[in-house]
Amino acid sequence: MVGGKVEAEEIVEFEEMLRELYKEFGFDNEVGSKQKQFTGLPATSYPTFSDFLESATRNIKEIQSGKYSKLEEQVVVKTLILRDKIAKIIRNIVKTYGKFFDGYTTIDNIADEQIITFDLSILKELKPEVFDASIINMISLCWDNCVTNGKIMQKRLDEGSIKMWDVVKTLILIDESHRWLNAKKIQALELISVYLREARKYFGGIGLASQRIADFAPEGSGNEGIEKLKNIFELTQYKFIFRQNSSAKRLLLKIFEGELTENQVNKIPKMEVGKCILSISGDTNIEFKVHLTKDEEKIFQGGL
């Protein structure tokens, strides 16, 4: 939300402020944590950013009004500087981006919903830090739901109360995925990498769509981002590759090293509409043409 790097001491102080906040709301992990329920409560039981700002402001004033020795003053001054910096960031979130981050969720229990959509049309126009923070929230929400649902389904499957075809699965579908999953967004790449590695254990899957592979590696992307992006493609079992610009051949060879032959890469810029290569990890590559029926063409609202 602030751009740049965050120092370790800022993270430690931020965590301490969060502990104070949750303690005020009755979530004290030091006392009776085994008996008290922390999860599964109504959304209104948990604090918002406005609550955090109020708590931070109040605690700063309490620290300022205290009496300290000269030695203690040095520590207190440093603490106040850190807390004031954090409070300013929280205030900016509440005042400027409160519409997106400050408030209670409209989905009280995501497990009760069959289909959930996220509209990114407004978010994509905001500065990168805000967009990325929203995306991380969405990924985390979907991943948490996948794990929760997957454990329940596995338990019922093991008990024999349901059959495999009765298992409720989790599928994440992202169109224009290059907007938030590219070589410059390291944290998002790491989260999706974890999802790709572990989601299958919880009956989860993901589909990523984009028009140009070059959009996944925008100009200025570093080697770390490229390698993490390559890892995403390696972990993806099925890849449908349609026609790409000839300028993308070098990137295709790098991303699909060991999966696509040079001859197949050379074919990609010359493919006709509908033709593609299906690359199956650990198996083979299949070249075929996607057939679009008249009924499908009527409801299709994209481009050619």
Residue locations for each model-derived region?
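P-loop NTPase motor domains
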Residues: 1-204, 278-282
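Conserved ATP-driven motor cores of ASCE-family P-loop NTPases powering translocation/secretion/packaging/pilus
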Residues: 1-4, 184-291
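Solvent-exposed, flexible loop/coil residues
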Residues: 104-105, 114, 272, 294-296
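Short, solvent-exposed amphipathic alpha-helical segments in soluble enzyme
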Residues: 134-137, 256-257, 293-295
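C-terminal alpha-helical "lid" subdomain
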Residues: 292-304
